[in-house]
């Protein structure tokens, strides 16, 4: 949008909404007309209007962008093309003319002429007519002050995420009491969002220009920003100390990749405003371009404010005067007074809508994507662009005809889609209002966030026409605008799951400074879904990737466009609009997913019944075993004979279809009885032997049976009292005189068995199932447990459960052997079967390895009845073929089947071949793919009815409305959705989803999350009691306080249980299910725990803070369980609480700590633990402070600038994980806690152009462990760090490895040891000590060197020795590329070395240094007569005990000059080593900081070359190596190193054990050849051997010059050694 060419006047104002977290950023687009252009006021000829009315008409025409002659004054504002945005503008213009009217009156007007007449009838509204000769600004521009009016339209870009690596207002930021109390409600809310979710509520605005206009823009912006009061003080502390009003930085890049990268970098770190210019230098220069990026916190501006500023900038560019706006704090005070005076009206308004808001649904019923690895606290957003399918012209025609605004159509379309996706007739989402319609001075001109977001709640009646709905929606919007000044204190909440924004463009300018690309805006958001409507009708759907998948949002966008199409015919009813949203493509997808095209799901496909199938099996395999119990068995022929005898007798007592109850005792005669009942034409009903007699009596009575069958004479005592006749199978089978008959034709439509299930009230429901359903179900081999001749099927399920039906008839209908339980062990027979059905609870306690036959891969195991957990899936599917089956009894045993595999997500799978499945809403309409609805089962498997329950049967068994062939479907009451690959994901019962205090809660999901958060709890039962949740947990020994504290950290406040009961077992219903009603009663009887009195100093401090912030009287008693929320605290007061406590403890208490610990004892314990809490930093002239970096860090930063993608500066640790011994979750938690407590690990290194130096900034979020399945250790160890954008540390936990990688800029080996020590301690349950001393307040770096030290170094290094004779000297370093070569020092040499070191005062480091100094001569050049060389060693540089426990980089390089030759009188070995030892001791004794040494010697640093020395030598003893370990069982330290070369040559000795010494040569491949390295690998062990054997110095040199033929050194392959446990090398 052009930035100049603005006329002197004639601005018109429009609002444009852009969504941000819980708010909208409202841009004002200003249209303009040439100031002195003649305006044709074409009034209707039959009407005479006074001058005042003419001015209003002129203003109206300007607002609507039409000629006055085109206005129809006999119609309303909307009919003339007005909308809510232009209404705001017209009200503002009228106000400037002295006419007061409301937005509601103008929007609801139906006759403009009458409106104007009424307005101007009052003297108070008479408009002063200007003198025509007056040369002042035209009244067509009511905002023609020197401040100007908003004028630029800025296209919206996608909302973007804020990564933890970016630098923003941190969680540890502390607000002063003054600042907190002086904030407006909106500012406090925005700041609260930033503190709780760092990086949110920051706006980035981009404009791209020709490079040569940037200086003009800079001057204009500087003038404007420095003039506005709101930028003059810090919102964090209310002061202007060290506050830069205007910050401007510039960076120049030469490639497009660098340019794009700079544009993507988000840098704002505080509540401030900042500018950054990215210059892209191109050839030719005229093609260069520059992008100006304005970053500003939303607590400083809203969109209206931004456009006021834009307008002033344009005026400044043209040299026009600029007048600052009024003080925001002054305007805010007036607004507060207004709110107080009108509070009762606001309270009354929202109280009137409270019931509707409570019932409204705003949450899309879409599943969250499955997370990969560990969950992250980072809010990540992506955008989906939805192209328009309906033009604005079409919609405008509809809107004009109905007298509503265009935006009403878009709001209505989203309401339709939201109603479908929320399965609710009442929906709510966010709507924004400018907040500038109050009749208060300064509201129109002030810069500051006056914007407000209100809940828009709508009810969609299906019988209502779309046009009536549009009109009602428009009226609702008008009404809402009248209360845009209200805040949540008036009784509403801003809990929006979605929100919509409209974009309105402005005109283009024809001259002046103009952007060469359309401007755009990026902004952070914590609203899960925002819909931004573009000017052409397209939409941008910006969504949180943690909450929605891209496929779901793409589909959502299509439905939104389809809704707009449906609204083009507004006469149709809302029901038709909702039904029309499901398109043909999705309908076809759903039909395919649901198995709707298969005839196998229909009754016409069934030609057999259970009896004919059994008899066919008998005829084919008469002598095969049919049923076995221990040593007793029956063949198919015997079973058929016995069952035939039972049937012959039964026919004398029953009619076809009569129910016969059978005593189910798991005996062979029980099976005989079942088949006898069916062969007689009866219906089998089991009376479980294990049930109480009262329950058996109830079932018998409900079944309608008059006859009772028992397997044996000993069972007669179980006969129900109402039984008319008792028959004994044991007697019946002995009668060989009865005729044995077989069924002449199948009867699939007849009833087969009656199975009782428990209802929600505990009263059993009898489900009547048909032959055809079970025959259809078991027709598939995989479904029927692979039952066939030769296979053995276990009978293990409860005889009262339809799982036993599946076992029995799968086997007996297809010739398999049914194996019954025998003996005392109910699972013993599993060792002798090929197929078995288990519940997941059984599988959890059983070990497949304990059952010889069951543990084979060919064995098929089916899990039914409960959700399958991942651990059960993994353990069992590794050893056998495992299936998950789902289906209620009413759907005949099973509806879906899914083979499970190790470490793959558990689902219930697609429909089985004989079932149709639908997922429907409450109106029994198909929901779109991926949307959560209720699962329905349709087709041949649907049972007949509930016996004796016609009302419940009518409710649950209904006609199939999808496949209309006269069949029925069953309403399961289970919630689920279709996955992308057509599998059903079952989420639990619908009656476990509730609405509590305005929030929709899934109680099953909450139970799962609680168990996951606190593994010591084995089960959770959650239920509702009034407006609170009650939780019962197992076992009774659980630490309830610890559980409560942990749950409060992972669940939102409204989902946290108010009472928690620890029980030995849950109360159950008669059917054995959890009795939630009984749990609620137990909770009601239990007293509310008030905790104890406050005793510890921290508890008292927190209690005092509670009392102060909440203004509690002395009569309010506080105790350890006192809750901040229950005492009246809310999110905004948490800001002040965090500040108050931080000041009290002199440590930064982040907002998230306060938010996660609501109770006094929990919060006090969290603060006492010290985890993640940093000391409040005070300016210490002797410490680094918050932003300064240490000189050694600066040294490494400069090295990184040579090649930031290098991995050579990575410090790493890796351990191999024993899966049986290591608790990965605990390891991840321990590592996260340790990384979070050291703030230096959040460092970002940023070059500040203003400061002219590199500064440290902090990410608000601590680094987090990445949990992955697999990892490539070499790739992970060598991933480079981006110092400005990412954390300087990362940790990965895979199935096999734990890898910790740190940039050398923040770590040395001591730091690595500290971190590993703390991780080990925390992993094993130890507590971590507080951190009294941090890297940032270390005073070490400001120590001044003594003159004695400096004199030493002048003498030592004043003139450096010649290096032309050394290996590697001739090469030119181009970077930090390099390799590592590894070899083993011969064990005999290492043993001699260890013996020598024990007998002398020489250290291993000194001996190694002496060795390397002798080996570096290049054989191709003449050898010097003496040794004179400078080598480097690592200097720990930790000079105090407290420094030894500080995480950070202290290690510095230290030069050691070794000079020894012919002038030395004693050339013995001891003399040479003594010289080396003295040299090392002297260097260490006179050590000064590296930067001080270089400055003193006046040596410049030119990376990658290293000053003073090129070779570094280090020796890691075995004890040192042991410090680099996680001291916990199952973690084995591996050998690692990073790729590349930090120096020309690094010689690193590592003692792996008492007899293994490894030598790694890290070398620059531009300087050393492979032959050089091979020579060093031969020389170094040889020199070491000679030195420890007392060989004279001269002889050693001669030997190295002409080495003898010796045993070659054992060279190790780097790819073999890397990643190998140290003990295995």
From Swiss-Prot:
CDD domains: C_NRPS-like
Region span, Disordered: 127-157
Biochemical pathway: Mycotoxin biosynthesis
Broadest EC class assigned to this enzyme: ligase
One of the GO BP terms on file: amino acid activation for nonribosomal peptide biosynthetic process
Stored InterPro entries: AA_adenyl_dom, ACP-like_sf, AMP-bd_C_sf, AMP-binding_CS, AMP-dep_synth/lig_dom, ANL_N_sf, CAT-like_dom_sf, Condensatn
One GO CC annotation: cytoplasm
Gene3D superfamilies: 3.30.300.30, ACP-like, Chloramphenicol acetyltransferase-like domain, N-terminal domain of ligase-like, Nonribosomal peptide synthetase, condensation domain
EC numbers, comma separated: 6.3.2.-
Region: Adenylation, residue numbers: 614-997
Entry-linked SUPFAM superfamilies: Acetyl-CoA synthetase-like (SSF56801), ACP-like (SSF47336), CoA-dependent acyltransferases (SSF52777)
Location of region: Condensation 2: 1195-1585
Region (Condensation 1): 286-567
Keyword annotations from UniProtKB, A to Z: Ligase, Phosphopantetheine, Phosphoprotein, Repeat
Reported function: Nonribosomal peptide synthetase; part of the gene cluster that mediates the biosynthesis of aspirochlorine (or antibiotic A30641), an unusual halogenated spiro compound with distinctive antifungal properties due to selective inhibition of protein biosynthesis, and which is also active against bacteria, viruses, and murine tumor cells. The non-ribosomal peptide synthetase (NRPS) aclP is responsible the formation of the diketopiperazine (DKP) core from the condensation of 2 phenylalanine residues.
Name of this chain's protein: Nonribosomal peptide synthetase aclP
